[in-house]
């Protein structure tokens, strides 16, 4: 299903998407097209993109083509999903140590829809960090890996 979503293949394209997406949540899925977990997430993203079109713009970003952002967001596990609103990086408290990105795939379409709605409402009120509406049992668990320390 990843062929249904637009792809950003360079740092310039990612920069342009961040700068030009206004009054919507920008969803950037970092990963690889052939990865099975990325394909699972892409299926959820593509099935919800039409329903969320007034609130969110969803793009796929290949980690191999954008090493600057892969390093900047410390993408050690794929897929990782990062959110922006009007050029501002939106953080979400998932009950995990990392609030900058969602790592892994969402369990259900509704989890993703709920998260986008919460980010959108919070961003419209000027918040830069919001509380995740996703049940903690549905948030993938992982250990933070600090590189080059």
Curated annotation (Swiss-Prot):
Any Gene Ontology CC annotation: nucleus
One Gene Ontology term from the biological process aspect of the record: positive regulation of cell population proliferation
InterPro entries: Dim1 (IPR004123), Thioredoxin-like_sf (IPR036249)
Keywords for the protein's UniProt record, in alphabetical order: Cell cycle, mRNA processing, mRNA splicing, Nucleus
Pfam families: DIM1
Coiled-coil boundaries: none
Presence of keyword Translocase: no
Record localization: Nucleus
Family per similarity comment: Belongs to the DIM1 family.
Subunit structure: Homodimer. Interacts with the U5-102 kDa protein subunit of the spliceosome.
Role noted for this protein: Essential role in pre-mRNA splicing. Required in cell cycle progression for S/G(2) transition.
Protein's recorded name: Thioredoxin-like protein 4B
UniProt gene name: Txnl4b
């Amino acid at each position: 299903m990843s062929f249904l979503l637009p792809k950003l293949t360079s740092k310039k394209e990612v920069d342009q998407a961040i700068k030009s997406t206004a009054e919507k949540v920008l969803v950037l899925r970092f990963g690889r097209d052939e990865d099975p977990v990325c394909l699972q997430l892409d299926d959820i993203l593509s099935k919800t993109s039409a329903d969320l079109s007034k609130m969110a713009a969803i793009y796929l970003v290949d980690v191999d083509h954008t090493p600057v952002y892969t390093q900047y967001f410390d993408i050690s596990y794929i897929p990782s999903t990062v959110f922006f609103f009007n050029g501002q990086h939106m953080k979400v408290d998932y009950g995990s140590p990392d609030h900058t990105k969602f790592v892994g795939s969402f369990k259900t379409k509704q989890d993703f829809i709920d998260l986008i709605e919460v980010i959108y409402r919070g961003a419209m009120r000027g918040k830069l960090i919001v509380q995740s509406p996703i049940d903690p049992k549905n948030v993938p668990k992982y250990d933070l890996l600090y590189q080059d320390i």
